[in-house]
């Protein structure tokens, strides 16, 4: 606030609000007559109209009949910079506004236009002119035209869009400052001139009355102009390139709905109607000031219909423009115009955290003697918010019938009886997905399904469809199964379910390898709790397992986030021809139960894992406790990473199987079996006779001493180890390439009970001090949206039980980061 602002006196008395990080000052309407005296080199814009002096626009007006680059060359060669001693005096008058803002810059260029009798000004930094020229002026004119059409006549003589140093946007009466040329941002900020500027709410107490309103009108504008995806495709040249040209377009409304639903189900939901500074954090503020009220207004438009909704909004605007508004004045205006009592709708949205979830309980149809069909539709409310529903009946010929079910108030169950002219085959409630119904799966008797290739880097998440993604895959192992081609199918729906089915058939051995796994989240219970399951017969290993995962944080959206998991896995059998090379001990069955806690605090990640064999399900008997911590800090192109692991295994004389002990080098068996190329030992590729690429592959984890990959160093039953890495990176944007040079050191103490003389496990722990150090190279790019990462490390220094040595030929590669 750059000037002393008059406190508003309204029906609640004096509003002497202090400054809060969320929400702006509540202002009183008045006239601002402001005179500026500044160096002439500065071009100025402000709320209001120029009544005296020259703001400098004419001297920097862009001739848009030229290509911008050509015009800038002419401008740079002809523009005469004012002398540093010259001054510019200019006066702006802003009438009937509750705030006044101004912006000045030596680098501004100007473009101007008109919408009816409204002057439209655009000022932008010369360095960003190629993106701003023409488009921002045209977008500004379209935005003010849209707002006048939908809400009412703009009451001021001008509107100005200016550039700003920081990204994002900020609104003032007659003036917005935007950090980018984005059309959606223009519409959003211009919407604020209506909702905040003209209809002046107290943003500290009721931020939703402006943020929610302009968010929803922006969404409707962008969908109206560009389609359901809600953005200008022409601005994204790569959308026409492979593979993006084959990606289905998303739905901007669905994205907003999913965002709200995730927050509503988090266990941290809060009422919309709350002072901005009372929300738990900025995330809760944004969802309750922007997302949720915008979706509330979309639902209101759905209930009233587009025409009545906008007519009612215009009534609200006409009645309260250039005055102070609040929740009651808005609700009263809508009810007054529509003639409907809507407290049941607004109270549930604004003053509770009740959720909407309707479902079809039953669908019965029967033919009548006159050729019509009777339908009995059982509707149930699993949630606690109530709303009328549009019911769509689909017939055999693909045509539909739409009608409203309005027996909704306070009903958890109802039967909707109606007749149709043709035989119905399916029914859907809320077919256009306009409500924030938590779970659409029960809204229809015939859920849509979309089959698509599993494009790398793409995620398609519609509210009203199952998404089935497919991807071919294969195993190839020349020493056993030969080629085993296969297919992976992923079945997904929002945050609630995911199922993966994979099958591979080996022609030579007639073996069928398969995987079935996935997860589920309850809709209404156990917030942020995921139930995982899996079973597979991969080459070398069979496994069955399950896990319950719970995420929790004291303040939603802010670290630390704690993840607590409990699970089990059983490996009943192994194929030694494949399993041994992955570090598995195939001599007996294995069953393990575990508890796991992980958290992140800023740049620090922590994990504690406790595991134990499962009685009769396991031929081994052991208990394991492992604590891992990692740190990653970076500044500009420099990065430092550190990992520390401490762990111990308690077991009997039989010891612990290789897949459950601590590997010195990493290369965890249970991690390696998830990678086809590691299961298949790089498909038999040999560097030279007797030496496979797999002998140089580093899968990070456990001891993580990369210098010991392929050295045959036995594992440990206890360890205290570290990995450190410092690196410097350089991005080559023209080549879409990142290169990173690293120096690393790994080391630790490792204990086991093996008596090397007798090769028998004893009772005394014997320690080994092991370490390595070296240099590395990391390469990162992407091809067709698939991220590609290659790590090459040269651990030339080795310290083992025989002492220290240098090995210039020691090298490892990996497709995973070391820490």
Name each model feature, range by range.
Residues 774-775, 807-819:
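Outer-membrane beta-barrel "beta-signal"
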Residues 563-567, 579-734, 743-744, 751-754, ...:
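C-terminal outer-membrane beta-barrel translocator/porin domains of Gram-negative envelope proteins
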């Amino acid at each position: 606030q750059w000037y002393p602002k008059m406190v508003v006196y309204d029906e609640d008395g004096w509003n002497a609000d202090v400054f809060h990080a969320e929400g702006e000052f509540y202002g009183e309407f008045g006239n601002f007559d402001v005179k500026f005296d500044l160096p002439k080199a500065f071009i100025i814009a402000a709320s209001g109209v120029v009544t005296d002096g020259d703001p400098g626009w004419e001297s920097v007006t862009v001739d848009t009949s030229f290509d911008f680059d050509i015009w800038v060359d002419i401008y740079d060669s002809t523009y005469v910079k004012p002398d540093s001693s010259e001054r510019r005096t200019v006066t702006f008058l802003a009438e009937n506004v509750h705030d006044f803002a101004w912006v000045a810059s030596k680098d501004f260029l100007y473009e101007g236009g008109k919408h009816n009798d409204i002057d439209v000004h655009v000022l932008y930094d010369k360095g960003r002119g190629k993106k701003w020229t023409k488009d921002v002026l045209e977008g500004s004119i379209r935005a003010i035209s849209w707002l006048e059409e939908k809400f009412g006549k703009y009451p001021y003589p001008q509107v100005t869009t200016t550039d700003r140093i920081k990204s994002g946007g900020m609104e003032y009466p007659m003036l917005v400052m935007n950090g980018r040329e984005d059309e959606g941002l223009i519409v959003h900020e211009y919407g604020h001139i209506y909702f905040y500027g003209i209809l002046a709410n107290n943003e500290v107490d009721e931020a939703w009355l402006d943020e929610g309103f302009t968010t929803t009108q922006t969404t409707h504008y962008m969908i109206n102009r560009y389609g359901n995806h809600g953005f200008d495709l022409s601005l994204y040249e790569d959308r026409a390139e492979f593979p993006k040209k084959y990606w289905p377009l998303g739905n901007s409304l669905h994205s907003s709905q999913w965002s709200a639903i995730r927050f509503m189900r988090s266990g941290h939901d809060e009422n919309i109607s709350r002072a901005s500074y009372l929300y738990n954090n900025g995330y809760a503020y944004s969802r309750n000031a922007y997302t949720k009220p915008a979706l509330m207004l979309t639902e209101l438009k759905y209930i009233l219909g587009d025409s009545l909704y906008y007519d009612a909004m215009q009534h609200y605007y006409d009645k309260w423009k250039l005055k102070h508004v609040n929740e009651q004045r808005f609700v009263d205006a809508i009810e007054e115009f529509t003639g409907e009592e809507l407290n049941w709708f607004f109270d549930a949205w604004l003053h509770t955290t009740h959720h909407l979830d309707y479902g079809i309980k039953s669908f019965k149809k029967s033919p009548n003697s006159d050729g019509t069909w009777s339908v009995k539709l059982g509707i149930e409310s699993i949630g606690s918010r109530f709303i009328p529903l549009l019911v769509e009946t689909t017939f055999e010929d693909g045509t539909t019938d739409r009608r409203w079910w309005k027996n909704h108030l306070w009903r958890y169950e109802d039967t909707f009886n109606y007749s149709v002219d043709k035989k119905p085959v399916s029914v859907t409630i809320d077919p256009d997905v306009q409500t924030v119904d938590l779970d659409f799966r029960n809204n229809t008797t015939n859920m849509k399904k979309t089959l698509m290739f599993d494009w790398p880097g793409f995620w398609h998440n519609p509210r009203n469809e199952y998404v089935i993604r497919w991807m071919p895959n294969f195993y190839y192992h020349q020493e056993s199964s030969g080629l085993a081609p296969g297919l992976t199918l992923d079945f997904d729906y929002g945050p609630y379910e995911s199922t993966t089915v994979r099958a591979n058939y080996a022609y030579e051995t007639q073996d069928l390898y398969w995987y079935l796994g996935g997860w589920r989240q309850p809709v209404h219970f156990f917030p942020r709790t995921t139930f995982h399951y899996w079973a597979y017969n991969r080459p070398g290993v069979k496994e069955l397992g399950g896990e319950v995962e719970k995420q929790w944080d004291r303040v939603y959206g802010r670290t630390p986030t704690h993840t607590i998991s409990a699970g089990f896995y059983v490996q009943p059998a192994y194929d030694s021809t494949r399993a041994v090379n992955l570090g598995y001990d195939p001599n007996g069955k294995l069953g393990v139960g575990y508890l796991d806690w992980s958290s992140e605090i800023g740049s620090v990640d922590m994990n504690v894992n406790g595991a134990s064999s499962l009685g009769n399900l396991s031929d081994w008997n052991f208990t394991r406790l492992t604590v891992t911590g990692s740190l990653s800090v970076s500044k500009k192109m420099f990065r430092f990473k550190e990992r520390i692991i401490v762990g111990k295994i308690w077991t009997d004389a039989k010891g612990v199987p290789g897949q459950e002990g601590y590997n010195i080098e990493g290369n965890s068996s249970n991690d390696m079996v998830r990678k086809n190329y590691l299961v298949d030992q790089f498909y038999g590729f040999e560097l030279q006779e007797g030496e496979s690429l797999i002998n140089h592959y580093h899968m990070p984890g456990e001891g993580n001493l990369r210098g010991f990959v392929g050295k045959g160093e036995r594992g440990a039953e206890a360890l205290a180890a570290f990995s450190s890495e410092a690196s410097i990176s350089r991005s080559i944007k023209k080549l879409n390439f990142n290169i990173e040079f690293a120096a690393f050191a790994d080391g630790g103490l490792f204990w086991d009970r093996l008596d090397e003389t007798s090769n028998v496990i004893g009772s005394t722990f014997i320690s080994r001090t092991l370490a390595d150090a070296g240099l590395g190279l990391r390469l990162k790019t992407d091809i067709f949206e698939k991220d590609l990462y290659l790590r090459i490390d040269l651990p030339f220094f080795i310290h083992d039980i025989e002492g220290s040595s240098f090995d210039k030929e020691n090298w490892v590669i990996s497709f995973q980061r070391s820490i």
